[in-house]
């Protein structure tokens, strides 16, 4: 990586759906922001880069396999990471879990010293891995992930338990075994026990803090 004053550091956090990725990312962001300030660190969720499906009917949208790499616009994410590294702002897409598509509005993200990426499929794409300074895989047992996913999708995303279970059996678990779990081999750090692993979070904080020196 070129040593430039505006050059941002990219940290990837991957793992199964509901493994604790977002909790680790938000904890690192919150605690490091208190140390260095909001202008120096940010979080980008891979979910924002689900492909636009506005041209499809709602019936077609709900049939999309959202756990397959083809559901993601990784090309746009790759372009945005390169732009941030050049010191340019990006327009972050906004994805609606209710409408199952990308919204028209975007959120402007300014370059930061450290950007934390989090998402299930980040490590499946070699282009994204090349942009990361280091990567983390959150290794949580699938039965725990399923319980968390049911609670989250029913309470926060308006899903029925039957629909969550059907999706899990049809796509979530098979795609985890086919794509996500094998991508663990590319991680620099593997974190067991999900987002409440305080020892792992403290180690990651110490590692990331080095980039602010």
Curated annotation (Swiss-Prot):
PANTHER family in the record: URIDINE KINASE
Listed name of the protein: Uridine kinase
Keyword presence, ATP-binding: yes
Catalytic activity: uridine + ATP = UMP + ADP + H(+); cytidine + ATP = CMP + ADP + H(+)
Superkingdom per UniProt: Bacteria
Pathway: Pyrimidine metabolism; CTP biosynthesis via salvage pathway; CTP from cytidine: step 1/3; Pyrimidine metabolism; UMP biosynthesis via salvage pathway; UMP from uridine: step 1/1
Cellular compartments annotated: Cytoplasm
Assigned EC number: 2.7.1.48
Binding positions (ATP): 15-22
InterPro entries documented for this protein: P-loop_NTPase (IPR027417), PRK/URK (IPR006083), Uridine_kinase (IPR026008), Uridine_kinase-like (IPR000764)
Underlying gene: udk
